[in-house]
Amino acid sequence: MAVPFRRTSKMKKRLRRTHFKLQVPGMVACPECGEMKISHRVCKSCGTYKGKDVKSN
């Protein structure tokens, strides 16, 4: 099995890991109730999506 010829430096290791981070979700205000929600998702407070009532009891 192959082994690394040289030890990976702290800088190279950290530069490689710069992309391993959490993404911030795109938050927008709901046009119906004004509550903050994730874009392209159903609003949790009023249950609407694209102007239609999706969450009905």
Curated annotation (Swiss-Prot):
Matches recorded under Pfam families: Ribosomal_L32p
Gene Ontology CC: one annotated term: large ribosomal subunit
Top-level taxon: Bacteria
SUPFAM superfamilies: Zn-binding ribosomal proteins (SSF57829)
GO molecular function: structural constituent of ribosome
GO biological process: translation
UniProt keyword annotations, A-Z: Ribonucleoprotein, Ribosomal protein
PANTHER family according to UniProt: 50S RIBOSOMAL PROTEIN L32, LARGE RIBOSOMAL SUBUNIT PROTEIN BL32
Similarity-based family: Belongs to the bacterial ribosomal protein bL32 family.
The protein's name in its UniProt record: Large ribosomal subunit protein bL32
Organism: Bacillus pumilus (strain SAFR-032)
